[in-house]
Amino acid sequence: MARNNDKNTVQRFNQISIGLASPESILAESRGEVLKPETINYRTHKPERDGLFCERIFGPVKDYECACGKYKRIRYKGIVCDRCGVEVTEKKVRRDRVGHINLVVPVAHIWYFRSLPNKIGYLLGLPSKKLDMIIYYERYVVIQAGNAKNEEGEPLKKMDFLTEEEYLNILDELPQENQYLDDSDPNKFIAKMGAECLIEILKRIDLDELSYELRHKANNETSKQRKTEALKRLQVVEALRDANKNRENNPEWMIMKVVPVIPPELRPLVPLDGGRFATSDLNDLYRRVIIRNNRLKRLMEIKAPEVILRNEKRMLQESVDSLFDNTRKSSAVKTDSNRPLKSLSDSLKGKQGRFRQNLLGKRVDYSARSVIVVGPELKMFECGLPKNMAAELYKPFIIRKLIERGIVKTVKSAKKIIDKKEPVVWDILENVLKGHPVLLNRAPTLHRLGIQAFQPKLIEGKAIQLHPLACTAFNADFDGDQMAVHLPLGPEAILEAQLLMLASHNILNPANGSPITVPSQDMVLGLYYMTKHKKTTKDETVIGEGLTFYSAEELVIAYNQKRVDLNAGIKIRTKDYNEEGELVYMIKDTTVGRVLFNEAVPEKAGYINEVLTKKSLREIIGKILKITSVPETSEFLDEIKGLGYGFAFRGGLSFSLGDIIIPEEKQSMIDEANEQVEGIIGNYNMGLITNNERYNQVIDIWTSTNAGLTDLAMKRIREDKQGFNSVYMMLDSGARGSKEQIRQLTGMRGLMAKPKKSNSGGGEIIENPILSNFKEGLSILEYFISTHGARKGLADTALKTADAGYLTRRLVDVSQDVIVNEDDCGTLRGVEVKPLKKNEEIVESLGERILGRISLNDVVNPSTQEHIVATNEEITEEIVAKIEAAPIESVEVRSPLTCEAKKGICIKCYGRNLATNKIVQTGEAVGVVAAQSIGEPGTQLTLRTFHVGGIAGNISEDNKLEAKFAGVAEIEDLKVVKGEAPDGGTADIVISRTAELKIKDKKTGVVLSNNNIPYGSQININDGATVKEGEVICTWDPYNGVIISEFAGKIKYENVEQGVTYQVEIDEQTGFQEKVISESRNKKLIPTLHILGKKDEVIRSYNLPVGAHLMVDNEEKIGVGKILVKIPRKSSKAGDITGGLPRVTELFEARNPSNPAVVSEIDGVVSFGKIKRGNREIIVESKLGEVKKYLVKLSNQILVQENDYVRAGMPLSDGSITPEDILNIKGPNAVQQYLVNEVQEVYRLQGVKINDKHFEVVVRQMMRKVRIVDPGDTIFLENQLVHKADFIEENNKLFGMKVIEDAGDSEKLKAGQIITPRDLRDENSILRREDKNLATARDVITATANPVLQGITRASLQTKSFISAASFQETTKVLNEAAVSGKIDYLEGLKENVIVGHRIPAGTGMRKYDSIIVGSKEEFDQMLEKKQEVNYN
């Protein structure tokens, strides 16, 4: 490919296979043997003949000139010089001609015996240590035993190891003629050492036989270890057998007889001044190999003693090892400066390796970079390009035009004119630029909006001008950012840039479908200022207040004549939508500024009559884009950009110290807080409260004081100048600043965190707050305290960026081959979507979650029976409104999680493309978009786990359940007892743990809502009662969990001893004594309460968890419904919550949390077993009698009680549930939804909106594989990981086939063969005719498998494409596996195609478009006419 530079000769290959190279194939590629270790002559600087840079082997150093100089110039092209043997050709052949070294003895390839899994070792069934003994010439190995016996006189077996002594003794004992026998004679004794012995052994392996033997072993082996050993070996054997289907791939090729020498230009030797040379490390490594090989040759010729030869062979093996992979060896070859040499493997690996440096990222021509400045007068699709830069970029186009116009004759003179910058050049450049956009890119390109196309405009100066609204997408600012410019050259590229990438088309953010080109900073401030309303007060009069105008034109005249103020409230006749939704003229109360703003708004959007903030602007732009078109929206954006800047300037909205108003109540509030703190410290000193409580209370006081002060300050600043205070306007409009920052300017800086020592303690809040604010100034101590936070913030940001970048890289890698490939995969599955709630508060409504998805079933309004949406129909905004209005709790929609497309994903399962708000098209690379959408906001996530101190992070607990809809209550599984109510009367107390309340619609009987009724709650309604919306159904104690007596009787304590298993604590508010269960030293003692019946028999026992408060005394008589125990709920556990980036990584990598919960796998009743080794045993028994036992650490809180009924998937102890458990118990669907929701939660806390779709695409990729449980008659192995599609395909192939059990007298059939029933019948009928024994067969057993959840790194490394996996991580391992199994890469993903230099199979590069012929309508008509003419004949 490299040699033929004509366009036509680029082979369009569509797959690449990899395999082991045979010595013959290496020789076939090679141009000659390198015999000498010399490189170039230090005096003449010419390559030495037969050396590592030899011209005869690799080609001439100068273009068309042989080494001795006999033939020069191009006319001798292709002649081989008779004197020096060099072919006369161009020098670039030295980049692709390969040489070789013939090794005197074979050498094992380090990849196949040093890396795990050890390929050669597994084939021979040898451990790595023993294999090393063979390869490094320490032991002889018996290849063929013959008649030899060992010292004990027992016959030797194949693969026995012998020391040299033993070997010589055996040779002495054997008869003389043994060595004259032929090698194939079974009586001959053969034993060898080193790689030459391995070649012999590997050649003798019959893979099919070995495979059969190992399969038998794996199926029938009793010992676990031997079984896994057999399966591991099987994997290597099967890989080699698989490879032989596509190409020849013999195991003995893992041993090398010939070493290839890579082209000299790829390992250059550069002369430096002063007669020294800089060389590539590879040359040193090759030299060592050649020197040792030549020395060994000489020693063998002079018949040196065996010991010396053996040492030399070992050294040769080591030198070849370090050539291929220098890092694997314990003693790597080092340079003089003690740096390990870079071997061939190192040049592939890592960021600087071949894959990532040269194949995935290349440097390109026709590019420029410069600093960016703002271009406020540009249109949405324009950018300013410096003249000189443009002249250089568009040079070839200008040259062409210069020659066409006849201004110059040659290219050379054209270049001169351009370099002189003659006026005619600018004239031509203006023309060339028309319709030829450029691409602008700002690093880091975190999502696809980091590269956009603009139409260039020539400007003076040297900086690129960028449109201010494009900044958000590029994440650019003008503090010295640089951007790169690229020039699309071909007509297709230009078209794509104009139609797909033009900045004015990229208004929406692909992550969530909301506009991204939203005015920010000055623009928002100007628009906010112009639409704000000001009333006349006694201090200032507003000119023209209350006037009425006929039209906007009239108003503009009045405003220009200074007859009316910008912020004056006026009336105007204008068009807007009435109740019926028609555009009509009406009189509106509004302000002058709003009328001016509405002049820019397209008429279809109605009249916008509100104060504009950043938030409202985003909604307005989204609305306008929906109602009108992209060009109109981009025009509107340009208009409001101008308005915003103009009025920000006219308003003079800067601020001074005077605008920062400190509330005069500040001092008194601080004094009051100090008094309270003193009171608390007094309480502490008197011993009424613990140190921890004191700390929490102090922090709470300061937190609330700070909050109160902030509110006051905000109020003052809001009331100042009618809200026209500059600082307040900046904050309120969302242009700049936050409430926090205003608080630090006007209130007090507040509490600061302690510096955190390395992970041990610290990180808490210092209880003395900073009382000053920035206007007053900080004292030296206060300043010192606050520096810590500032520095930590900067350090964190730097670390975070790298982490987020790496996460994005892994995400892209796992999902890069998800492309929309088909219209409909035809699946019948989907996911059920409900509104997202937190503490009964709706975080994300049902409508938001299903918008733009495809409905799985028909949706009908349960109350009116109205048909809302059909199966496979898109849920649009209108349909969402209907669904929200109806009492529908959940909707089933199609989802990427359940898509069954073989390759990529289908349109119906993906739904709407968020970047266009239309249904996605085939060819869209949704995987990469998903990865970018998740990775891009990664830098905004917090890096650390965050700490919730005291009540600062507390939300008041909810304590009641209210009916959400009116209807009929239906309660399942309810058990109640009469008990005491908190207010003293009696009440119904719930004692069942799984009571469920359903509210049904009176007329239709459709279930409207479904809730769990908590244990211990007081219930106010009966089954079947009619409830009103908002009626309280049950209440409970929000601070304590309780255990309630179900029986009347007498209390008996067991193992409840003061000072051992419980302590007496005094409640500081009431002074009452309470018994609190504590952890006892003696782990055997389990504190238990028994309830005794009439005859002192135990009716019921309750285990008491640590921290429980006893509410009854020993021997006390109790009635039913008595509260026996209160367990304080840990309100806002002050532990650290893993949040932010680490949590996202943990979920995507499917790691198990450090303290996992124990989860029940079945529905059943709980009972407690014994304590074993510090673990409490919990037994769950199902109704069918199935029993599962679980061990829970004693330190973990147990969440269930004796005799509780638990459902599968319920946690038995506290901690987070592992994804593995969810998968095993609730199945793949549940775990996928769990992962999506958990990751969303992290982003939601940071206020980042990302559509669920993107997470679903990635999570789907994590569940591509299944693990084979029982291979049946398939080719799979037990425990093997295979793709779901392959698994289904293999099973379908076998469907209905038969397996021969006994071949009878048939010659065609073998036992174990799989054939169709028809073939079996035919064969048997032949046998029947000949009166022979018939063949018997059984039905095929198909394979069974379990779904597997893989982390994104694992999933990327196991993609089908080895090129993609190798360029990701663990390059050598991936290539090593791929070569052994002779893998074929079908180039289906994006990455593989970038690497081999093809167009990516997405978008316009989809393979189905390749065969399309583009022509004009006339040509088509002519073709049809010709065709018809032919038909008539």
Curated annotation (Swiss-Prot):
Alphabetically sorted, this entry's keywords are:
DNA-directed RNA polymerase, Magnesium, Metal-binding, Nucleotidyltransferase, Transcription, Transferase, Zinc
Q: Which GO terms describe its cellular component?
A: DNA-directed RNA polymerase complex
Q: Which GO terms describe its biological process?
A: DNA-templated transcription
> Which residues does the annotation say bind Zn(2+) 2?
825, 899, 906, 909
The organism's place on the tree of life at top rank: Bacteria
Q: Any idea of its EC number?
A: 2.7.7.6
Where is Zn(2+) 1 bound in this sequence?
66, 68, 81, 84
Q: Where is the composition biased (Polar residues)?
A: 329-346
Cite the SUPFAM superfamilies for this sequence: beta and beta-prime subunits of DNA dependent RNA-polymerase
The record's region (Disordered) falls at 328-347
- Does the record bear Membrane in its keywords? no
What GO annotations for molecular function exist for this entry?
DNA binding; DNA-directed RNA polymerase activity; magnesium ion binding; zinc ion binding
Q: Which reaction does it catalyse?
A: RNA(n) + a ribonucleoside 5'-triphosphate = RNA(n+1) + diphosphate
What cofactor(s) does the depicted protein rely on?
Mg(2+); Zn(2+)
- Task of the protein: DNA-dependent RNA polymerase catalyzes the transcription of DNA into RNA using the four ribonucleoside triphosphates as substrates.
Q: Which family does it belong to?
A: Belongs to the RNA polymerase beta' chain family.
Subunit and partners: The RNAP catalytic core consists of 2 alpha, 1 beta, 1 beta' and 1 omega subunit. When a sigma factor is associated with the core the holoenzyme is formed, which can initiate transcription.
Q: What is this protein called in UniProt? A: DNA-directed RNA polymerase subunit beta'
Q: What gene does this protein come from? A: rpoC
